[in-house]
Amino acid sequence: MAERSYDFLMPSVNFFGPGVISKIGDRAKMLGMKKPVIVTDKFLEGLKDGAVEQTLDSLKAAGVDYVVYNNVEPNPKIRNIKEVKKLYEESGADSIITVGGGSAHDTGKGAGIILTNGDDITKLAGIETLDKALPPLIAVNTTAGTGSELTRHAVITNEETHLKFVVVSWRNIPLVSFNDPTLMLDVPKGLTAATGMDAFVQAVEPYVSVDHNPITDSQCVEAIKLIETSLREAVANGHNLDARTKMVEAEMLAGMAFNNANLGYVHAMAHQLGGQYDAPHGVCCALLLPYVEEYNIIACPERFAELAEIMGENTDGLSTRDAAELAIKAMKQLSEDVGIPHSIKEIGAKPEDFELMAENALKDGNA
């Protein structure tokens, strides 16, 4: 008999591989979408033959009308989701397609939440607070990555208080996700590093979570191996399709893992840094990871010793504690190799803000 029971959440359909973006029009039509709001940013919208252009071409070919919202910001704000809601209602839209990285997906999810569950999203922060389904949602992913294209998390920033909060619900999971690595070949080095380290953290945290299970363990292990062997190359040579493909596989695995085994204090604290200083989420996560996990070693040293081996470190002859410390060293080295800043000072962190951020981190859905 199993020692415990657990739920396992996944999107119903995931398209993966070079060229799959061409299928989005037919899939949107199959879902009954007649006029989706395309949620993206100006940069992606302006790319010739980029993700947005290919999405729109496929929709046109399938006879699906659309309207475009192109004002997605990093660390999406409440004002962004309200803008999408307004466009949705005024244009007579019936669905949402997000095109971008985590910010686009969170903006689309946030808009969907307030379209059906009430206008004040701050009251919905927490776990499984949504009573009503979102409008039909498809996510086209362009970074590897937050995993937001297939998870139940919507992360929004209150621009007035600088508080970053999470709405966690199975209702947020997109009906369909698209991960086409050819759309990621021109992602800049800095963004590749930041999003890649976010994926790494999202594989590490569920592995040492109290909610881990055999399914999520296998996903975390493979994701960590893929990132350890592919992220450096993806940063150094963005047009290496094999490295990009492996990073997409890794971020999908990590996303499925933390969708079920959850995250932890790295993300709870990173949300506060990002909300307070509008700093890149992946950079915040990477900066905090080794220090939070060094603190956590005492809770499960054997899991961290396993992480060292998964990352390719030689633990022969080492005590469990020493092997666990080797995992922390390997985490720092990976961040160093891909150009992550060395200190939170470099993203503008100020000691006078620490107490408030600590209080808010304890209220975060990942704490």
Predicted regions and their residues:
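ATP/NTP phosphate-donor binding region
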Residues: 1-95, 344
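Short glycine/serine/threonine-rich phosphate/pyrophosphate-binding segments
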Residues: 21-24, 47-49, 78-81, 103-110, ...
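A glycine/threonine-rich phosphate-anchoring loop and its flanking beta-alpha core
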Residues: 22, 116-212, 303-306, 310
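Short beta-strand/turn micro-motifs composed of small residues
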Residues: 39-40, 100, 157
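A short, small-residue-rich loop immediately preceding and capping a beta-strand
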Residues: 88-128, 134-142, 269
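Active-site segments that bind and position negatively charged phosphate/pyrophosphate groups
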Residues: 206-330
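C-terminal charged capping/lid subdomain of soluble metabolic enzymes
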Residues: 304, 314-367
